[in-house]
């Protein structure tokens, strides 16, 4: 049987969150989406608050993922230990609060979600994402119907290499972090659905979610300052993965944009 999974790119502002509060549930119903993963690490610019996480769950997210801005709001650390459906990268060092892998029982099917962070182009102290994926996948005792991997990374080569490495072992793998949607949606030879980057949920007229004039000023040689979220209409970018419960693999990947 086919089940549709929706993955949405980094929510880059409060206005991006507001868009999801208004549109997400109706969109899921219209497209028969059964499971939704949303990257929420940029709602506050850098980081996520407990109130924002609760609002995102209420809007229709089943799992919230985080990346290099996981601890942008330090107070989230304690919440990560108690909220099992907010996932930070699994290859953070062992002392980091929270967890990066979770099994979700959806009744008719089960989903395992794994979050990893890349080591190319990211100044972050993390363990090898490839060996971390191996370790966690091999440790699966109750085999889920589907396994989903979010790879929060800057380098396309690292994301593609991970997709080839995990092809046939996971249902879908998507990238986040760059805030720019890529057009390489595909199903790999052994059945893993893939896209290099989901894109962003945030202001359309922006530079990766921030006010264009602030970014222009920075590149003109201005002093670094506190960036502010851009204003105006928003869109939510991502992909729908059509997964087969008989094989646990992907049959189709479609790009979506919600406005």
PLM-predicted stretches and their roles:
Residues 1-259:
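Acidic, metal/ion-coordinating pockets
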């Amino acid at each position: 049987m086919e089940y549709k999974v929706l993955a949405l790119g980094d929510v880059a502002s409060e206005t991006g969150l507001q868009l999801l509060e208004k549109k997400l549930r109706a969109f899921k119903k219209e497209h028969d989406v059964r499971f939704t993963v949303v990257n929420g690490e940029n709602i506050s610019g850098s980081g996520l608050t407990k109130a924002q996480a609760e609002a995102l769950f209420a809007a229709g997210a089943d799992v919230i993922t985080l990346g290099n801005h996981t601890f942008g709001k330090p107070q989230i650390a304690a919440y990560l230990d108690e909220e099992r459906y907010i996932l930070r990268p699994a290859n953070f060092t062992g002392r980091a609060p929270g967890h990066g892998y979770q099994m979700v029982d959806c009744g008719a099917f089960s989903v395992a979600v794994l979050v990893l962070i890349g080591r190319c182009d990211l100044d972050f102290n993390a363990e090898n994402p490839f060996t971390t994926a191996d370790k966690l996948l091999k440790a699966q005792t109750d085999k889920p119907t589907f396994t989903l991997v979010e790879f929060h990374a800057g380098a396309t080569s690292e994301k593609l290499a991970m997709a080839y490495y995990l092809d046939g072992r996971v249902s879908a793998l998507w990238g986040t972090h760059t805030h720019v949607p890529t057009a390489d949606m595909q199903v790999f030879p052994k059945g893993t659905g893939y896209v290099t980057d989901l894109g962003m949920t945030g202001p359309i007229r922006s530079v990766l979610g921030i006010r264009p004039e602030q970014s222009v000023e920075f590149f003109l040689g201005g002093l670094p300052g506190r960036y502010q979220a851009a204003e105006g209409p928003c869109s939510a970018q991502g992909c729908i993965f059509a997964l087969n419960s008989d094989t646990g693999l992907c049959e189709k990947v479609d790009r979506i944009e919600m406005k």
